[in-house]
Amino acid sequence: MNIKERLHAARKEYIEKYKVSPNIIFVSQSLYSELSSMVGGLNFYEAAPKYLWNAHVIMVLTPNYIKFAEHSDVKKAIKLFNIDNSRDSYKIEKTKATIGSVSAGKHIPSQIINLEPIEFSREEIEIYAMQT
């Protein structure tokens, strides 16, 4: 599977799981050259942030790695990291709020749905904090 297929599959999996479009892509340094050629010379060392599918691209050192996430979740993980930086990973609970409605005379109340938690490694948190 090439980088484009892997990116599409990972993005699709994230959207199916969390029902929102991600706005961060963590990608490994080892996949940098493939990603660079795909988008026409992406340079991670320039001062300006880089985007793909309206998501901020952040390079990590973990080899062969692609992960989609949301800024708000990483920021929650950073708060946990600042409280206790001894752990290797930080799990963030995710929820989705629904909007209530009235349909055919039936009232459907709004609710909060618990989604699968997302976990961030110490490396992801530290590099995110440096690059944003």
Regions found by a protein language model. Give the residues of each.
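Exposed extracellular interaction/assembly regions and N-terminal maturation sites
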Residues: 1-5, 11
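Extended oligomerization regions of viral-like shell subunits
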Residues: 16-101, 107-132
